[in-house]
Design a protein with these regions (language model features):
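C-terminal end segment of the histidine kinase catalytic
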Residues: 163-194
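Two-component histidine phosphotransfer core
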Residues: 1-164, 170-174
Length: 194
């Protein structure tokens, strides 16, 4: 038991320090899919230690997308919402979270889907479409609305987040951005992700 606690504490320290390092590194507003996934995996490890490993994760990350550019910390808030609002409140025993990345045409499409309680997707999509930047910039809006506003600001109004959901079945959040690979293919991964 003691050895297990040491491993757990060591893993938790590693993940937390990686999360802080990644979050505080503001040298570039863009990162890569690989680094974003490293950040998400560290976050999910911390959540598993905190809440117990009650969720099954399915990562379907196309290796062709790993060097594609994304705004820093754009996947983790969506994953956090899926856990906090979708999966935490469901009574199902088979909680699942899917994270998929793929190229569709000239775009990088990232899908984050849960089998949680679902939500009012129409109302949320209306808020996303409205893209109230003043609300986001004032700090009133955080999470998915903030991520959507950043995606639209960086890549254009045609990009961003779309949500589909069914009550009792789960929610699927789709992030669409242009597929732009990082110029330096040999870039060092910040988070050991991928």
């Amino acid at each position: 038991a003691n050895a297990q606690n040491c491993t757990l504490v060591s893993g938790m320290c590693h993940s937390l320090s990686a999360i802080f390092r990644y979050s505080l590194n503001m040298t570039d507003e863009l990162s890569t899919m690989q680094n974003e996934m490293g950040h998400v995996r560290n976050y999910l490890y911390v959540m598993d230690v905190r809440n117990g490993a009650t969720i099954t994760y399915d990562y379907q990350i196309d290796s062709e997308t790993l060097q594609d550019r994304l705004p820093r910390i754009c996947l983790q808030p969506v994953v956090e919402n899926a856990i906090s609002h979708g999966l935490r409140n469901t009574r199902r025993k088979d909680k699942k979270l899917l994270i998929r990345s793929e190229h569709i045409g000239d775009n990088l499409v990232v899908t984050i889907a849960d089998n949680g309680i679902g939500m009012d997707a129409q109302a949320m999509n209306e808020l996303l479409e409205k893209n109230d930047r003043k609300r986001v910039e004032s700090g009133v809006s955080i999470g998915i609305l903030n991520v959507n506003a950043r995606l639209k600001k960086i890549f254009g109004e045609q990009y961003g987040i779309h949500i589909e959901s069914q009550a009792g079945e789960g929610t699927t959040v789709t992030i669409t951005v242009p597929a732009i690979a990082e110029k330096n293919e040999n870039s060092e991964s910040e988070n050991n992700g991928g």
